[in-house]
Every structure is written in structure tokens, then in C-alpha cells.
């Protein structure tokens, strides 16, 4: 295992994401504790020391499980523990401390190594700033309750810049993989953090497992990298970035632990070959060629006059072709239609097309998407 130094603290370059543990009978709120313990111990024995959990994971049971696990195996002082403030639950200033105390109790600790403001977007961030979150962050760090303060991010790049510049962060966490270099914060966000010497944590390096099971044309191109698996080829992209502190992976099998730890122990910074860079570039184009409409989910088109969730409809349409998920996309579309407005309700007012920064034919796209997904 290779490590990243942040203020004298050695962090493993692979982190264990505690959101996708094995569960019992398909119930996400019932972690299979025996199997999950084995996976964590396997990873720790291979040198992993960064454990990433959060308040809502596994229907609010992940923190409890992690706390029990660390106590049972006497690992509290041997790992770097990360959890996140559930910002969406904050309604008043007192909630910051109340929620943190609940988390400390769940994790059975009196301090947290890495504490993040969870899943920030522009509305959420501005709301908690108005409630005093930045002063709260400063206070808990000064008291030693939290060693490092950061944030995880889910919005467009300009919002990332706003949040990044609002505070003296110790680190930040963004979604990045070889496919999503322009998605959300993307490579621009990584480069901004790097320029300012703020370490970056990477989430979704395999895009929720989709890059582990790529389309046939990408499988064919990947053969040149054998014996590396598709997952390992994908992991090499974020692991090679020199300002990446750790790459998170929600591992639920020993094979995943073994493969991912192997990569985190072998990939050097700035080590991508021209051939690998070309593979990532060609793969991105292969995915783009499968895309049905170039929606970036910026939501400029929202709210729709008749309240159709335009980005949601286009996302399901694209996913069916991007990841060979026709059946799943059609099932998810049926679920959406239970409460959501059907594209059939479109009155063709054209407001969405007037404001779309991608200049998409949204009206036609909605008709085509509905025709395919219904």
C-alpha cells in the first residue's frame, strides 16, 4: 500500500467506503456484519487505513457498525476515520453540534480524523453558511474534536469554486473517474484544489461499478492491459493523479479488496503512459457515441412549466444506452411516472430550449425518450 502525507498523517491511497457493505436479504438497513468485518479486516491487513462512513449510509446504520467494529478489534487509533455532517438535517445553528454529538456516540469516539460537510450543492451550502457552519467548523477543529475539515461535493463547477473559496479547507472530496472528467467539479475542480495545495479525495472512481462492466467495444480495447481487470484499468486513472489523497471504493467482495489494494500499492503518481491516456480518451468518446442526448443535468431548464423532471428523463434514457441498462432504465422510468409528470404532458412552450446552455432539442428529446422508455 502506498500512502499520502497530509500534515504528518499517513493516509492510505485507497479508502474503504462504508456505503456498500454486504447486506442481509437485500435489506440495505441490515448490514451483514460478519462478512463486512472480514472485508474490513482484509483491507486493513493489506495496509488500508482510511475508513469513510456517513450518517445516512445503510439507512443510518453504517456509523454504528463502524464504531462497533473499531472497538471490537481495538483499531480506533490505528485508522483514519472519516464521517460527514448530514447538512440536509440542519435547520438551526444548534443542529450542527447536536448532529456531531450523535455521530461521536455512534462511532464510540471523542474525535473524528476527517469530517466533511456532506453532499454540498449551492442551496445547501448557502443555507448552512447563513446558519454559521464555517464558525462551527473552526470551533470543533480548535477543540480537537475534528482533526481535518473538508466537504463532499455534488453540483456544477462554478459552485465548487464558490464553496472552495469560502473557507480554508484541509481537503475536499469530488466525484472523478476517467469518464466524468467534465462532470460536476471534474478535472477543473481537481486542478483548482491542486493549485491551492488542498488534497483531494476521489469518490465514484468506478462510477458506481459501471466501469467494472463496460460496453463491448471498451472491453475489446481493454485487452491490451491484461491481466488487469476492467476495475483496475479504471482505478489507475485517479490513483495516478499526484494530489489525490485517497480513492474511495465501496468494496463488498474479497476479490475487490485484493484487486483495489494491489492497484493502490503499485500505481505511482504521474505514471500514465501515452497508450493509457489514449485509451481513456477513446473510451470517453465511445461512451459519448452511445449517448442519446447531451444533457449535463445542469437544471437550467428547471422548473419546467408543467413540472416534468427533464434531467431525470434524459438521464434514464441515456443510461439505457451508455451502460446497456435498458431493462433497469425502463423499470426506473415506471417508478418515476408514479409520482412524476410524464413527458406526454409537455405543452411545447419552448422555455427550456431557450435557456438550455447545450442548445438541445428538448421537446423532441422528451418525446423520443418517453417513446423508448414507456
Residue ranges and their predicted role:
Residues 42, 46, 106-107, 167, ...:
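Structural motif
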Residues 17, 54-57, 115-118, 152, ...:
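Conserved residues at the C-terminal ends of beta-strands
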Residues 3, 11-15, 49-50, 78-84, ...:
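Structural preference for beta-strand elements that scaffold enzyme active sites
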Residues 57, 73-93, 118:
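Structural motif corresponding to the early beta-alpha repeats
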Residues 37, 44, 48-49, 188-374:
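Structured C-terminal cap/extension of enzyme domains
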Residues 2, 35-39, 62-70, 99-103, ...:
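A general structural detector for well-ordered alpha-helical segments in enzyme core domains, enriched
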Residues 24, 88-206, 214-219, 225-226, ...:
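Glycine/proline-rich, positively charged
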Residues 1-79, 142:
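N-terminal binding-site loop/beta-alpha segment at the start of enzyme catalytic domains
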